[in-house]
């Protein structure tokens, strides 16, 4: 049987006039969607701006060379953001050595006295509170979001130098790794962004999808548009830390380890090409690691995360970062499992995570203690105190 193709007039014949109408209709619909998206974006920016706070600090830093006196009173400006519980989250260095702190909301003229209730110097975060409840009228606190991925768009809000009003800059997350926080010298998870950050942005919110994903912390002065952000996992760690009313900081294993990439070293430790781990070469006394580790052990995994021969771990949602993050992402006092190899045997152990207590701290936070005896002045050393007496390079 032959099949005949249907013929005749099409169901819809597009005339020139109808084509024009259709084009106009499609164009108007696209225009309407664009206008609606623009209005939504504007409303979101206004909501975030309403939660933005300018922080004014009068500080009196100690004179480390003469600990009985201060280095004088200085004035600093920074930024902050209202979060759940009518609390203001900012950077710790914005309110360091504070004598007086006041805050002002975007679009208002009145300053309100604020109290620094918690300061997490290790992660450069602080919580401020304002007793006057009218300060928070009409504010929707920013909610914490998810950790952005590499290449994700972010927006920085704050009050940087160069003007009096709010500044909004956009960029992307260009790097996510363990980095040194200049305020404390601690090595913690850190995000790098290319959004323009300047003095005064410190403590301001980094936003993605209308949610808080970071706090602006510092910039690389030798480069343009290289800013560093305290990412949301560190913010969450800090907020959980202070739930008991005190700041414990971040735990540390307290060991030094070296990669096991040399084949001769692998053979001496009885490892094959498929094995992983890090060679422990030093264990601090009274540290977390002192309970179960000793030099010569091969640390295989911590908290269920295998340690690569390059001293990195793979963390879901974060990627490969330094192995120290396996411990530092946990709270002081928590228990984690440790897998190790010793004398050819594999061992499973549990350790209680202890706070970091360096013999010589990096930075002096607060007024230093001192003792005058027999015409001599004694005070606990810190690295910034030692640097006072280092000779400048020739």
Provide a role label for each language-model segment.
Residues 51, 55, 63, 69, ...:
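Active-site region of chymotrypsin-like
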Residues 97-115, 149-155, 166-179, 233-236, ...:
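Beta-strand/loop subdomains of soluble extracytoplasmic proteins
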Residues 43, 47, 81-84, 92, ...:
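C-terminal recognition in membrane/secretory proteostasis and scaffolding
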Residues 38-88, 96-102, 109-111, 132-136, ...:
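Glycine-biased strand-turn-strand hairpin within the trypsin-fold
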Residues 15-29:
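Bacterial N-terminal signal peptides
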Residues 40, 73, 94-96, 100, ...:
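Flexible, gly/ser-rich surface segments that form the specificity/activation loops bordering the active-site cleft
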Residues 1-12:
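N-terminal secretory signal peptides that target proteins for export/translocation
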Residues 61-62, 82-166, 199, 347-348:
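Conserved active-site neighborhood of the chymotrypsin/trypsin-like protease fold
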């Amino acid at each position: 049987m032959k099949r005949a193709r249907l013929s005749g007039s099409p169901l819809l014949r597009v005339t020139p006039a109808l084509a024009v109408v259709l084009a106009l209709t499609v164009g108007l619909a696209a225009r309407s969607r664009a206008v609606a998206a623009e209005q939504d974006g504007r409303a979101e920016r206004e909501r975030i701006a309403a939660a933005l706070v300018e922080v004014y600090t009068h500080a009196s830093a100690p004179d480390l060379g003469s600990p009985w006196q201060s280095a004088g009173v200085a004035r600093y400006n920074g930024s902050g953001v209202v979060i759940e519980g009518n609390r203001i989250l900012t950077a710790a260095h914005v309110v360091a050595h504070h004598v007086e702190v006041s805050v002002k909301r975007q679009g208002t003229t009145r300053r309100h006295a604020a109290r620094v209730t918690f300061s997490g110097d290790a992660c450069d975060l602080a919580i401020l509170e304002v007793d006057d409840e009218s300060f928070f009228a009409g504010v929707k606190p920013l909610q914490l979001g998810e950790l952005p991925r590499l290449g994700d768009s972010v927006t920085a809000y704050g009050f940087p130098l160069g003007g009096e009003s709010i500044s909004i800059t956009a960029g992307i997350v260009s790097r996510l790794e363990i980095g040194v926080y200049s305020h404390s010298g601690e090595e913690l998870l850190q995000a790098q962004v290319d959004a323009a950050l300047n003095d005064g942005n410190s403590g301001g919110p980094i936003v993605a999808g209308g949610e808080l994903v970071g706090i602006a912390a510092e910039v690389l002065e030798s480069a343009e548009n290289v800013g560093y952000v305290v990412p949301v996992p560190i913010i969450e760690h800090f907020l959980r830390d202070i739930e008991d009313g005190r700041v414990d900081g971040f735990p540390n294993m307290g060991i030094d380890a070296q990669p096991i990439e040399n084949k001769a070293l692998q053979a001496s430790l009885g490892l094959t090409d498929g094995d992983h781990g890090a060679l422990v070469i030093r264990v601090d006394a009274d540290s977390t690691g002192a309970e179960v580790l000793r030099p010569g052990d091969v640390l295989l995994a911590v908290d269920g995360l295998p340690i690569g021969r390059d001293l990195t771990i793979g963390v879901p949602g974060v990627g490969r970062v330094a192995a120290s993050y396996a411990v530092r992402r946990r709270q002081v006092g928590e228990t984690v499992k440790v897998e190790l190899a010793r004398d050819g045997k594999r061992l499973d152990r549990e350790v209680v995570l202890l706070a970091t207590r360096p013999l010589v701290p990096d930075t002096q936070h607060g007024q230093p203690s001192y003792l005058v005896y027999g015409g001599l002045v004694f005070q606990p050393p810190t690295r910034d105190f030692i640097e006072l007496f280092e000779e400048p390079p020739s």
